[in-house]
From Swiss-Prot:
The gene is ytxB. PANTHER family: GOLGI APPARATUS MEMBRANE PROTEIN TVP38-RELATED. Keywords: Cell membrane, Membrane, Transmembrane, Transmembrane helix. It holds the Pfam family VTT_dom. This is TVP38/TMEM64 family membrane protein YtxB.
Amino acid sequence: MKRKTAVKWLAVLAGAGLLYWGNKTYLNVSPKEIRVWVLSFGVFAPLMFIGISIVRPLVLFPVSVISIAGGLAFGPLLGTLYTLFGSMCASAVSFFAAGLFSAKKNGHYERLEAIQKQMEDNGFFYIFLLRILPINFDFVSYAAGLSNVKALPYFAATAVGIIPGTIALNVLGASFLAGNLPAFFMVLALYIVFISLPFIFRKKMQNLFQESN
């Protein structure tokens, strides 16, 4: 790795570390606190919620907290719809920001080369699996932005892949307020399906890894 590239990545890591520290120190808020703040905007609450969802990846704020807050603030149906829309916008921000920063057409980055190759070779299916797996949402978005993966399969895979987790977290958030036991078991069932999918597609995943080696 060239010295200039190494310095750039050290700066990125330092910036990420600073953002993480600031997040934990100043943005360590709960879903209930987000709910109260968002609903204070009245009829503009949905717009504010979508707005913070869009800027969230820029400050490395956990997507799970936002998703639960969506269920708390708007209920399982509207909360899920607003969270899905906000998450798609956030994934676009991360994807294009990473692409602009890295000048992605000029090559690969050693640390991410295996993931980049998988994304480029297998497109929709690989990104879909990464979205299904309990992997950091923004890591997948930034990794895709650093690769040569096309925008259409990236967004299509993201839209489909985030549905199970988004529904589960929003229903969980809504059940906190309602004290709804059936909703809790519904979330539990969704999570069982959610974590089982990688095992169901295990053979396909192994084939993908073998093809890239």
